[in-house]
Design a protein with these regions (language model features):
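AAA+ ATPase "lid" subdomain C-terminal helix
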Residues: 1-8, 21-24
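Terminal amphipathic helices with adjacent charged low-complexity linkers/tails
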Residues: 7-11, 15
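Peripheral, non-AAA+ core regions of ATP-driven protein-machinery
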Residues: 10, 30-53, 57, 67-91, ...
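SsDNA-processing nucleotidyl-transfer enzymes
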Residues: 59-63
Length: 274
């Protein structure tokens, strides 16, 4: 029977808003279904070299939701520097392109004080068929690069968000709650293993407003939220290997991530610049 009530109450308005959200949420559900069917390739366990789970936010009107995105890096001898594949095919916005250029500055200051930075590296948002903008994935791209250069694999149970500056410090980003929720739902779909979680900028801790379900999972150590302030802190969480800090002679400790990356770049430079 049709409701002929003339006065629109608060309950009617709330019902209409809730139904609108449910209609829009079908896109969120569809992404999870694609991950379940492996139409979207996302790992939530295991270790892989040069591959990191990034976190993105999709907006539809005034509704937004987060989803993970696979980001990969391949590094090899050459002089082309860092190639942003999205930029090459005109799918990268200015903020994302700026983030990649900042990453070049970080690598140069960190590893090229005693030699030219001689490498070619490809960075890619896998299975991206629309545009990408924003610099919130620049830390994720840095971790993928360090993993590729050092040969040390990244823990796929962890997803990452955060931008970086040329000094290697992590900077705050937007949409932190949606991003955490997106990866949490993906891990829930696949099954929790006790290691899964996200790395966020320490500045975004004040912005956290997570669901009771996620808070409960964190309390039970089913899911983790790590807050970091530097690339070195993040890479240690992702690999379990010390990052390594330079001594007074500019040398990294043997066996650390930065030592291995520097040695690879030194090899590239020696061969490329003969």
């Amino acid at each position: 029977m049709e409701d002929k009530q003339k006065i629109i109450s608060k309950d009617y308005i709330q019902k209409a808003l809730d139904e609108r959200i449910e209609r829009i949420k079908k896109y969120d559900t569809r992404y999870l279904q694609m991950i379940k069917e492996e139409a979207l390739l996302i790992d939530t366990e295991g270790f892989v070299v040069g591959q990191v789970n990034g976190l993105t936010v999709i907006k539809i009107g005034d509704y937004s939701f987060g989803k993970p995105a696979r980001i990969t890096a391949s590094t090899y001898m050459g002089k082309e520097g860092i190639i942003n594949i999205e930029r090459e095919i005109e799918m990268s916005g200015p903020s994302h392109s700026k983030g990649v250029l900042i990453l070049t500055g970080y690598l140069g200051e960190q590893f090229a004080q005693d030699m030219p930075l001689s490498l070619t590296a490809n960075l890619c948002f896998e299975q991206l068929y629309g545009g990408v903008d924003g610099d919130s994935a620049s830390s994720t791209e840095a971790y993928a690069m360090l993993s590729s250069l050092s040969g040390i694999p990244i823990n796929q149970s962890i997803a990452v968000t955060g931008s970086i500056n040329q000094k290697g410090y992590i900077q705050p980003i937007g949409g932190v709650n949606e991003k955490i929720e997106g990866f949490y739902q993906t891990c829930k779909l696949r099954g929790f293993n006790g290691d899964q979680g996200v790395i966020i900028p320490v500045q975004n801790v004040r912005n956290l407003h997570l669901s009771d379900e996620i808070i409960d999972a964190v309390r039970k150590n089913k899911f983790h939220v790590y807050a970091v302030s530097t690339i070195d802190e993040g890479i240690e969480i992702l690999t379990g290997v010390p990052a390594g800090k330079k001594d007074r002679n500019g040398k990294f400790p043997l066996g650390t991530i930065n030592y291995l990356a520097h040695e690879k770049l030194k090899k590239f430079s020696g061969i490329t610049n003969k």
